[in-house]
Amino acid sequence: MTAHDQRLTGGPAIAHRIGPNAILQLIPVLEAAFGPGAADRALAAAGVPRPGPESGMLPETQVSTLHRWLRDTHPEEAPRLLREAGLATGDYILANRIPPLAQRLIRALPAFLGARVLATAIAKHSWTFAGSGKFRVVSGRPLSFEIARNPVVAGESSDTPLCHWHAAVFERLFSRLVWPHVAVRETACCAKGAPACRFELLPKGR
């Protein structure tokens, strides 16, 4: 049942959620960039509660609000900081969410097969980073993903793609397990008016 269906039937609306690392990994990045207490000040200014280290899934609106606050308040630094947070999120996933045996198996496969296995796993767990958006693998060669109605940039308007955090997460996972020199390029973005944010993986880099 969709949120729209629930409104029609009088049921509660769905609170779509995203994994806490979309905020947790940004906290040390903000502290490193702007000094002690910077993360708490940012969260307070954005009106977002600070998640604890054992937080479960967070409302996607908290993630989008903090990311948008950073882009609005620090437009020059935001792409780099969100990228750093995305790389750290990828490191967390590798350390805590993908079993070592699975990682060894992916690395042992020919790259095109390893990429397919990893992409399938990402799609299976896309609810953790796409929230109310819809993730799908668009093509295999070149490997491309998209997140339709990406909630992390909901309501944004920009001349350039904004999904530095998502792109960096994908980059870290594929660089560690499949293509060491991979680059991830966002070729379409909801913030630019596209129906989906699309990411193209370049195995040999840019």
From Swiss-Prot:
Gene3D superfamilies documented for this protein = Trafficking protein particle complex subunit 3
- Pfam families annotated for this entry? V4R
Q: Name one GO biological process term.
A: light-independent bacteriochlorophyll biosynthetic process
Which pathway does the record list? Answer: Porphyrin-containing compound metabolism; bacteriochlorophyll biosynthesis (light-independent)
Q: Which UniProt keywords apply?
A: Bacteriochlorophyll biosynthesis, Chlorophyll biosynthesis, Photosynthesis
Q: Indicate the transmembrane segments per the record.
A: none
**What InterPro entries does the entry give?**
BchJ, NO_sig/Golgi_transp_ligand-bd, V4R
**What PANTHER family does the annotation carry?**
DNA-DIRECTED RNA POLYMERASE SUBUNIT I (PTHR35090), SLR0144 PROTEIN (PTHR35090:SF1)
Its recorded name reads Bacteriochlorophyll synthase 23 kDa chain
Organism expressing this protein natively: Cereibacter sphaeroides (strain ATCC 17023 / DSM 158 / JCM 6121 / CCUG 31486 / LMG 2827 / NBRC 12203 / NCIMB 8253 / ATH 2.4.1.)
Higher taxonomy: Bacteria, Pseudomonadati, Pseudomonadota, Alphaproteobacteria, Rhodobacterales
Gene name in the database record: bchJ
